[in-house]
């Protein structure tokens, strides 16, 4: 990891799969996170499921900067959305989405 990077952009999404489409929803989310992790400019990407059984999913990705986030997001749309139709058809409702700027040292990402 470059020592020049001081602050990173963390994309945070909270969402749920549509009833009967949860398994496909999770596969699609995981494929997108795997794709992001392979791209230069993405430092980490993961998903987490709620522990209360409510079906909520936390999706987070860490990018070196806003330009990397934009480029990788556009690449995901071109590479995956065109093949599988995108996440909209498997979402239970609108996701809660936020982008946060965080000091890299606070994340303690592996080198």
Put a short name on every predicted segment.
Residues 17-19, 65, 101-104:
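Non-catalytic surface loops within mature trypsin-like serine protease
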């Amino acid at each position: 990891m470059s020592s020049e990077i001081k602050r990173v952009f963390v994309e945070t999404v909270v969402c749920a799969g549509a009833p009967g489409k949860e398994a496909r929803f999770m596969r699609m989310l995981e494929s997108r996170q795997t794709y992001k992790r392979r791209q230069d400019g993405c430092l980490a990407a993961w998903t987490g499921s709620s522990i209360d059984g409510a079906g909520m999913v936390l999706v987070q990705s860490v990018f070196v900067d806003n330009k990397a986030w934009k480029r990788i997001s556009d690449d995901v749309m071109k590479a995956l959305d065109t093949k599988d139709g995108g996440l909209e058809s498997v979402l239970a409702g609108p996701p809660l989405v936020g982008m946060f700027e965080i000091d890299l040292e606070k994340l303690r990402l592996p080198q």
